[in-house]
Amino acid sequence: MEVAAKLRGAGLSAQKARLVADQIRGKSVEEALDLLAFSTKKGAAVIKKVLESAIANAEHNEGADVDELKVSTIFVDEGLTMKRIRPRAKGRADRIFKRTCHITVKVADQ
């Protein structure tokens, strides 16, 4: 039994979120939550909320035992990129890319 949780449009780049996602892939949910709780990266807090949602989905919808769950699949896709302008000297302007991502976490029995 595999249960998923998704977050679409998270406010960080996919590249930065993947750094955190790669650390918890394949680990038990307890170990993954510990890693995320003590990580200093912004993506860790976002992914932790998605993982907790997936655990709650498994408990509520499937009646799964939390102690036997592991992070079976986690992936991060690029979301929309919002384009902004930053005024510069002499009438010039630079483009600023506000990147977003879609985070998907799947937990399954070991």
Swiss-Prot record:
The keyword RNA-binding applies. One of its GO terms (biological process) is translation. One of its GO terms (molecular function) is rRNA binding. Gene3D superfamilies: Ribosomal protein L22/L17. It comes from the Bacteria. GO terms for cellular component: cytosolic large ribosomal subunit. Keywords: Ribonucleoprotein, Ribosomal protein, RNA-binding, rRNA-binding. CDD domains: Ribosomal_L22. This protein binds specifically to 23S rRNA; its binding is stimulated by other ribosomal proteins, e.g. L4, L17, and L20. It is important during the early stages of 50S assembly. It makes multiple contacts with different domains of the 23S rRNA in the assembled 50S subunit and ribosome. Part of the 50S ribosomal subunit. Belongs to the universal ribosomal protein uL22 family. This is Large ribosomal subunit protein uL22.
